[in-house]
């Protein structure tokens, strides 16, 4: 499924995908400063609220299994529109939830809808190719970093003016805007073919039988898990353990987001100078170094905002350097299965991030040590995967 687009069409598509990226930060990032308010309103602990975010990611990962194959068979546009509408319905339900169980239920509905956002990878694959494709992925990662950097501050303002419901209000409004924009911009693409269960999952069998495909997505997933685990744990570390105010937390995360943007800029520069494999290795080395730095600083000076942020700035630079290239290499292996490839990769990314953050959350009073140890372990696994991939040539 390939659509040739003129430059203005490409520019409009990039803007739409950037807006979708902005929309995607609300369920996981903008809501972070509202952890204390949510725990108070629903009479639960901040750790359980963090646990709910991890469950959101795991549920999203499972549901992504269906999105890709359906998009390859029935078209991206209809599924994207249905997903955006469903995510808005889930967010609306969260506003009217009477207890924590209902909040979780409607968060699952929101997660089902948000699964459609993974189609952005396939939409990029449909329009761009080669070095331009890799460059667009880097831009998307950088754009995501900008939104992530601003999201805690935005969440703090929304919490101040609208309460914990604020992020859901804005999510609903943005969903409506993206839905209307998608109706106008995206071309119709559909199929009347109704697949059998065997046909439906045959694409996954083909993809997961390719060690290079699985390896590149696992590298991206392991790097993402480092970032995601910190995001989920950050309210617990800064607001609960270090007693930072919501605004202090927001400014600390703004600095973290700035590092995310810097990593994207650095990735773009490195992309012009060095091969993709070297860029992946560079990013993984930075993640490993961040784990060592965090262990060293916290052992020498104790846990503080500074001893946590310095290694996290290194880690996020590594994440943004290696992930776009790993994603592009994985997606380029099976271009005729772009939607299924997106779902398979997103499954690994969100499942890994959700499960690893759940494990780290169990550390309770030793969150920084658990984070640092996970950075070392995950980067080591990624190094082994990268070495195995380079030993095996791709067979089309």
Protein language model features and the residues they cover:
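Helix-breaking motifs and short loop linkers at transmembrane-helix boundaries and internal kinks
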Residues: 43, 75, 96-102, 129, ...
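Helix-loop-helix hairpin linking two adjacent transmembrane segments in secondary transporters
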Residues: 102, 131, 138-184, 251
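A late C-terminal transmembrane helix in Major Facilitator Superfamily
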Residues: 327-365, 375
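Paired small-residue
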Residues: 86, 90-93, 101-109, 306-312
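Juxtamembrane intracellular "pre-TM" segments in multi-pass secondary transporters
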Residues: 2-7, 187-217
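Cytoplasmic helix-loop-helix junction between adjacent transmembrane helices
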Residues: 100, 106-144
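Conserved MFS/SLC helix-loop-helix module at the cytosolic interface between two early adjacent transmembrane helices
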Residues: 62-100
């Amino acid at each position: 499924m390939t659509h040739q687009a003129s430059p203005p069409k490409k520019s409009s598509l990039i803007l739409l995908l950037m807006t979708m990226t902005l929309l995607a930060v609300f369920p996981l990032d903008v809501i972070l400063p509202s952890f204390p308010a949510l725990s108070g309103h629903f009479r639960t602990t901040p750790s359980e609220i963090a646990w709910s975010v991890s469950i959101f990611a795991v549920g999203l990962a499972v549901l992504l299994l269906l999105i890709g194959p359906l998009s390859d068979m029935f078209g991206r546009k209809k599924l994207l529109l249905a997903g955006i509408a469903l995510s808005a319905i889930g967010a609306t339900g969260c506003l009217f939830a009477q207890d924590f169980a209902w909040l979780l239920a409607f968060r699952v509905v929101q997660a089902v809808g948000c699964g459609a956002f993974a189609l952005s990878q396939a939409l990029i694959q449909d329009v761009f190719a080669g070095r331009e494709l890799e460059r667009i992925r880097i831009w998307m990662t950088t754009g995501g970093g900008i939104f992530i950097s601003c999201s805690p501050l935005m969440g703090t303002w929304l919490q101040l003016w609208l309460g914990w419901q604020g992020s859901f209000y804005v999510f609903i409004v943005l969903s409506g805007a993206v839905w209307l924009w998608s109706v106008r911009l995206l071309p119709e693409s559909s199929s009347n073919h109704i697949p059998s269960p065997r046909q439906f999952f045959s694409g996954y069998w083909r993809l997961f039988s390719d060690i290079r495909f699985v390896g590149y997505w696992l590298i991206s997933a392991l790097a993402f898990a480092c970032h995601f685990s910190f995001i989920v744990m950050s309210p617990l570390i800064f607001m609960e353990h270090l007693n930072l105010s919501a605004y202090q937390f927001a400014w600390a995360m703004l600095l973290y987001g700035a590092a995310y943007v810097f990593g994207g800029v650095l990735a773009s520069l490195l992309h012009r100078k060095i091969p993709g494999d070297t860029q992946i290795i560079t990013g993984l080395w930075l993640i490993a170094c961040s784990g060592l730095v965090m262990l060293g600083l916290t052992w020498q000076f104790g846990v503080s905002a500074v001893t946590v942020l310095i290694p996290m700035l290194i880690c996020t630079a590594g994440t943004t350097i290696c992930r776009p290239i790993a994603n592009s290499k994985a997606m380029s292996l099976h271009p005729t299965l772009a939607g299924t490839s997106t779902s398979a990769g997103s499954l690994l990314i969100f499942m890994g991030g959700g499960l690893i953050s759940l494990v780290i959350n169990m550390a309770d009073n030793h969150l920084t040590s658990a984070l640092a140890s996970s950075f070392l372990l995950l980067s080591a696994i990624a190094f082994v995967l990268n070495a195995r991939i380079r030993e095996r040539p791709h067979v089309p």
